[in-house]
């Protein structure tokens, strides 16, 4: 153990090589202690689509805080890392890279294209692991998993087959969300709805007998070639006599029937609705009720097919313009009604999705959802933090639709279904025997395999595997509220179905990282922050402190460099007080310090400030542990900050100088012991949040790694309310004198008279017993503490519990000079107020300047006014004193 830290805190030096050393020492693996209670977390697997962003840094920091604390508390901890193949997202990235060279996946073919995707995966998996290391994540790499690993693939096949056998996976032709760019189906929750400028196109469909026209309206006229009927409400007197007759479909000039169906709302539009069963989910249901043909008029890539006649091969949106023009030419266009409406867009490619009839594989959700809902009323329920997200989960499960799980991609788990020439389907974990079978080319939705993550990573379907028996169900899941539907809910219902248990006991839901203005970080806004850039400037510990200290379950966090500066300053403060303690340590060991601290707690040694700091340390340990248990890391961080900076550094360390600068060697040893012991406990409390710097400092005072050191526990023998109250009263006196000096601009170096009039005999005795502390911090020329102290006429006074503090003004200032100074200061702020007031009264400025600029001026005005008002009050007080 070296007893010296470098003079200046340098995070790059502190963090360099430390992570690799931890890995070499195997400190992140489970302890293997069968007597210890297990605590496990599976990392939400990041997509191998690219580098991790600030949201990932937040998510993994919270997990690392939990697992590091539990490890120190003696739990047998497992934090299992891994990554997700992220089917559509990764395939889109690789296709984009190939497109830069003018190559498509079809040019390469499936096998060679997948080779390229695996190369991409290896490249970005290495990058992600490097980022994990920079963040200091204490994961067990010996158990690292990937969603396309053979073990996980086996689990995927088994789940698919079992659900198929139960009739809960089925294949059918239904309207689904189609992504024309990725050329694949999407589930409902992979579709993001955006308000876009569009139009209602009103068209006339002439009755076959030519007697009249029926007006219909659509936002997608390009689908009209798939119209197989128009519908009217059977109770609509305007049209019910027309049911059973035909209208002529414009452009194609073919007859289609008029059907009576309650889907047509007499109160909406004209009450006549065009029915396109292959391109609209509601029309599909109408078509089923009336046995209408299903006509698909688009290709996989969003171009029109041969059924669109002269528009064959045109992109759907180009076709829209051309069709509207044609309708106008033939006199079938009534009007174009501009409007804003909600249009579904692919979450991954960003293009508008196309509702489209397609043959896909689905998971039947009824019973799975019922099981998940019912489980929340049992002892095996999942606890959400904050609890309001339990309602979010239940609401979604109660309204869930069947889940389309097939994707027309190449990257992913190929569906374990085979077909032969006779039209037979074989579903199994292994390929069927014999010739003539061809496997379904589609792959499964990424979320299908991700839903099995908590138990497939533990060895399932081998329920006898050691990890599955020991660490499943997992203890806690940490994730963002944006994927409760995508992932959390699916893990719950799949785990209940296949293991009979919930996948995790707790779910900690966090929000999103936003910029300083509260905007979501995005490429389009250019406001994204690379966590590695932040680490390079401030260090991982500072970033982790910011992410945890601003964290409240379920709430968003605003990133700012000002807060990062504050984080770095806090760590620098810890570094400096650690150096002070070590420089004054005089060879004291932690074991000896513990023995001496025990004597202080027993009242056999030390002074009241020693007992006070141990009492407050004890309270801090208790409160931090309580808040960690509730995942209130932000609250815990504030408690730690206040204790370390305010109570320990600003007060206790300063108070110890009264002893350390004395000649009493016995008292010095006790004080050094309390300093060293408290520092040790602070480092242990901070370690889950700041692993690097705490390990560096801990190495100066103890053997071994802090990673596996014992986490602090509150000790009853440290409780000392009397010492706590006494020192708080001392602090009140010192603060009162300091504040009075500051009010009248009297330097701390100037000796003054201080009179303390007590009304409590115990407090009187306490102040007199500890008068040296008051003298050290207040610099009195004369100090008197008594119940009958004489108070002169002109004084500054303040009141604390049990005493009044008086400072004779004659010692403090020349009142006339102070009044002159205050009048000058008042004029200065009046000038500032006039300037900002003039700017804000300028209507052109307020109307044309950016809102944040205007707000900044208003904030200035408020600040200046507060300063002006405070000086006015001070002048009034001074004038009263003169009288």
Swiss-Prot record:
Pfam families: Anticodon_1, tRNA-synt_1, Val_tRNA-synt_C
Sequence motif 'HIGH' region, residues: 46-56
Record field: catalytic activity: tRNA(Val) + L-valine + ATP = L-valyl-tRNA(Val) + AMP + diphosphate
GO molecular function, one term: ATP binding
EC number, as in UniProt: 6.1.1.9
Residues noted as binding ATP in the record, renumbered to the chain: 523
Coiled coil spans: 809-844
GO cellular component, one term: cytosol
Disulfide bond listed as a keyword: no
Domain of life: Bacteria
GO biological process, one term: valyl-tRNA aminoacylation
Keyword annotations: Aminoacyl-tRNA synthetase, ATP-binding, Coiled coil, Cytoplasm, Ligase, Nucleotide-binding, Protein biosynthesis
InterPro entries, A to Z: aa-tRNA-synth_I_CS, aa-tRNA-synth_Ia, Anticodon_Ia_Val, M/V/L/I-tRNA-synth_anticd-bd, Rossmann-like_a/b/a_fold, tRNA-bd_arm, tRNAsynth_Ia_anticodon-bd, Val-tRNA_synth_C_sf
Subcellular localization(s) per the UniProt record: Cytoplasm
Position of sequence motif 'KMSKS' region: 520-524
Enzyme class per UniProt: ligase
Function, in words: Catalyzes the attachment of valine to tRNA(Val). As ValRS can inadvertently accommodate and process structurally similar amino acids such as threonine, to avoid such errors, it has a 'posttransfer' editing activity that hydrolyzes mischarged Thr-tRNA(Val) in a tRNA-dependent manner.
Domain notes: ValRS has two distinct active sites: one for aminoacylation and one for editing. The misactivated threonine is translocated from the active site to the editing site.
Subunit field text: Monomer.
Annotated HAMAP family: Val_tRNA_synth_type1
Family statement: Belongs to the class-I aminoacyl-tRNA synthetase family. ValS type 1 subfamily.
The protein's name: Valine--tRNA ligase
Organism: Streptococcus thermophilus (strain ATCC BAA-250 / LMG 18311)
Record gene name: valS
């Amino acid at each position: 153990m070296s007893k010296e830290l470098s003079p200046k805190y340098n995070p790059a030096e502190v963090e360099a090589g430390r992570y690799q050393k931890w890995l070499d020492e195997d400190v992140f693996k489970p302890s293997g202690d069968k007597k210890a209670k297990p605590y496990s977390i599976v990392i939400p697997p990041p997509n191998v689509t690219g580098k991790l962003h600030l949201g990932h840094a937040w998510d993994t920091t919270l997990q690392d805080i939990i697992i590091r604390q539990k490890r120190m508390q003696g739990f047998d901890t497992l934090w299992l890392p891994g990554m997700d193949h992220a089917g559509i997202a990764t395939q889109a990235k690789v296709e984009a890279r190939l497109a830069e060279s003018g190559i498509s996946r079809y040019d390469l073919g499936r096998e060679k294209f997948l080779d390229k995707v695996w190369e991409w995966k290896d490249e970005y998996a290495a990058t992600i692991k490097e980022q994990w290391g920079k963040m200091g994540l204490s994961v067990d790499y010996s158990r690292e998993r990937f969603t396309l690993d053979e073990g996980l693939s086996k689990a995927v096949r088994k789940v698919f087959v079992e659900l198929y056998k139960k009739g809960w996976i089925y294949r059918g032709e239904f309207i689904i969300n189609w992504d024309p760019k990725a050329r694949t189906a999407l589930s409902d929750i992979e579709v993001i709805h955006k308000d876009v400028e569009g139009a209602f196109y009103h068209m006339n469909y002439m009755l076959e007998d030519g007697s009249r026209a029926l007006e219909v309206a659509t936002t997608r006229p390009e689908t009209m070639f798939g119209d197989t009927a128009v519908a009217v409400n059977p109770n609509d007197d305007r049209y019910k006599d027309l049911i059973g007759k035909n209208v002529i479909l414009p452009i194609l000039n073919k007859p289609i029937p008029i059907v009576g169906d309650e889907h047509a709302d007499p109160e909406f539009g004209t009450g006549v609705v065009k029915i396109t069963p292959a391109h609209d989910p509601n029309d599909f249901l109408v078509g089923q009720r009336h046995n209408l043909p299903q006509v698909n008029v688009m290709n996989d890539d969003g171009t029109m097919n041969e059924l669109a006649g002269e528009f064959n091969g045109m992109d759907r949106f180009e076709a829209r313009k051309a069709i509207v023009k044609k309708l106008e030419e033939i006199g079938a266009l009534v009007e174009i009604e501009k409007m804003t409406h909600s249009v579904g867009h692919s979450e991954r490619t960003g293009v508008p999705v196309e509702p489209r009839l397609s043959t896909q594989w689905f998971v039947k959700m009824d019973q799975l959802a019922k099981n998940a809902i019912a489980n929340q009323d049992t002892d095996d329920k999942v606890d959400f933090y904050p609890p309001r997200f339990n309602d979010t989960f239940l609401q979604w499960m109660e309204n869930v639709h069947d889940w389309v799980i097939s994707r027309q991609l190449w990257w992913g788990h190929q569906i374990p279904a085979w077909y032969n020439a006779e039209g037979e389907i074989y579903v199994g974990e292994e390929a069927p025997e014999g010739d003539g079978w061809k496997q379904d080319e589609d792959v499964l939705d990424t979320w299908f395999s991700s839903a099995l993550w908590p138990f497939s990573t533990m060895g399932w379907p081998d329920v006898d595997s050691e990890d599955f028996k020991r660490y499943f169900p997992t203890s806690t899941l940490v994730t963002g509220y944006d994927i409760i539907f995508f992932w959390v809910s699916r893990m719950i219902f799949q785990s209940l179905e296949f293991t009979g248990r919930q996948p995790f006991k707790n779910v900690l839901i966090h929000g999103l990282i936003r910029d300083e203005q509260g905007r979501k970080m995005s490429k389009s806004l250019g406001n994204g922050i690379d966590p590695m850039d932040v680490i390079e400037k401030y260090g991982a510990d500072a970033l982790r402190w910011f992410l945890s200290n601003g964290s409240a379950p379920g709430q968003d966090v605003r990133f700012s460099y000002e807060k990062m500066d504050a984080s770095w300053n806090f760590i620098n403060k810890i570094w400096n007080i650690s150096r002070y303690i070590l420089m004054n340590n005089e060879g004291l060991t932690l074991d000896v310090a513990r023995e001496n601290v025990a004597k202080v707690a027993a009242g056999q040694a030390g002074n009241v400030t020693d007992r006070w700091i141990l009492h407050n340390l004890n309270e801090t340990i208790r409160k931090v542990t309580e808040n960690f248990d509730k995942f209130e890391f932000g609250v815990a961080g504030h408690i730690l900050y206040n204790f370390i900076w305010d109570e320990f550094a600003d007060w206790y360390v300063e108070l110890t100088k009264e002893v350390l600068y004395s000649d009493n060697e016995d008292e010095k040893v006790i004080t050094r012991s309390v300093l060293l012991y408290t520092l040790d406990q602070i480092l242990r409390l901070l370690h889950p949040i700041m692993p690097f710097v705490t390990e560096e400092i801990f190495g100066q005072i103890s053997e071994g790694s802090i990673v596996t050191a014992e986490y602090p526990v509150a000790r009853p023998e440290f409780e000392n309310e009397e010492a706590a109250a006494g020192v708080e009263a001392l602090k009140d006196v010192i603060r009162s004198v300091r504040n009075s000096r500051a009010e009248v601009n009297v330097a701390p170096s100037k000796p003054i008279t201080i009179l303390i009039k007590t009304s409590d005999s115990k407090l009187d005795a306490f102040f007199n017993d500890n008068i040296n502390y008051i003298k050290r911090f207040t610099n009195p020329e004369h100090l008197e503490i008594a119940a009958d102290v004489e108070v002169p006429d002109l004084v500054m006074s303040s009141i604390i519990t049990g005493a009044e503090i008086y400072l004779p003004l004659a010692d403090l200032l020349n009142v006339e000079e102070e009044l002159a100074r205050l009048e000058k200061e008042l004029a200065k702020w009046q000038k500032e107020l006039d300037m900002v007031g003039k700017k804000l009264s300028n209507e052109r400025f307020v109307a044309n300047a950016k809102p944040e600029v205007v707000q900044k001026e208003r904030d200035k005005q408020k600040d200046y006014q507060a300063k002006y008002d405070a000086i006015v009050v001070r002048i009034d007080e001074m004038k009263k004193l003169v009288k």
